């Protein structure tokens, strides 16, 4: 899942902004106590799948977390993200792909708290929900209201989601659906422009956003399956030990 997150620019930008907020909080802190720093960095430091809670158990052995190392990696990730944005804006796909590999390697080495991890996944889900919403509105206007056959819609709309002239050939076709499409052209194009904004924000095509979402779903399924298998294995071990006694 973390590998999928590293391929979605809005996630990387969110981490940048989160880190910037952390830096601002630290700058305002008069007392640079190590415990307080750990609390602030809890987004990026956890032990045994639990966010570190400072002084939550006075009898527990203190967990050593290298705040400097965490900050170093996040700074590195931020620089790499800025570099990626620049390459994407310059439309340099080859160098951008190489930069994505570096980002993936860095992010895979950053330990993220479960709470932040869920939040990062939600960013991808939110983008996908927006894609579904605008595509549904376009489909409602084109297929349900105008009567363009669903097969034809799917065949030509996929890959042309943000091509604003896509609907024109069906308006010019002088079919039963043409006049209704012409009446609703402004609404159709408006939704296509909303889809285009999602592409601009993510530096991905609509199909690219869908692919990231598919990868995320597959990753979550694999993670859930692995957890289930671990629980079942532990249960079998407990039963095996119990039988001996």
Segments the model singles out, each with a brief description of its role:
Residues 1-245:
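Transcription initiation cofactors for RNA polymerase, centered on bacterial
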């Amino acid at each position: 899942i973390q590998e999928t997150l590293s391929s979605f620019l809005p996630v990387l930008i969110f981490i940048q902004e989160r880190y910037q907020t952390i830096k601002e909080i630290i700058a305002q802190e008069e007392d640079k106590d190590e415990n307080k720093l750990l609390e602030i960095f809890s987004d990026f430091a956890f032990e045994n799948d639990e966010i570190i809670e400072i002084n939550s158990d006075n009898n527990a052995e203190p967990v050593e977390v290298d705040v400097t190392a965490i900050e170093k990696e996040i700074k590195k990730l931020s620089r790499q993200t800025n570099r990626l944005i620049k390459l994407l804006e310059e439309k340099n796909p080859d160098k951008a792909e190489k930069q994505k590999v570096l980002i993936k390697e860095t992010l895979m080495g950053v330990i993220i708290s479960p709470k932040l991890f869920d939040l990062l996944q939600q960013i991808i889900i939110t983008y996908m929900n927006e894609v579904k919403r605008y595509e549904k509105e376009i489909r409602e206007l084109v297929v349900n209201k105008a009567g363009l056959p669903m097969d034809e819609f799917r065949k030509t709309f996929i890959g042309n989601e943000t091509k604003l002239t896509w609907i024109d050939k069906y308006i010019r076709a002088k079919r039963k659906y043409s006049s209704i499409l012409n009446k609703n052209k402004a609404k159709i194009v408006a939704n296509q422009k909303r889809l285009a904004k999602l592409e601009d924000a993510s530096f991905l095509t609509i199909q690219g956003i869908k692919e990231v979402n598919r990868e995320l779903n597959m990753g979550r399924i694999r993670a859930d399956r692995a957890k289930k298998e671990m629980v079942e294995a532990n249960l079998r071990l407990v039963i095996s030990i119990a039988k001996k006694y």
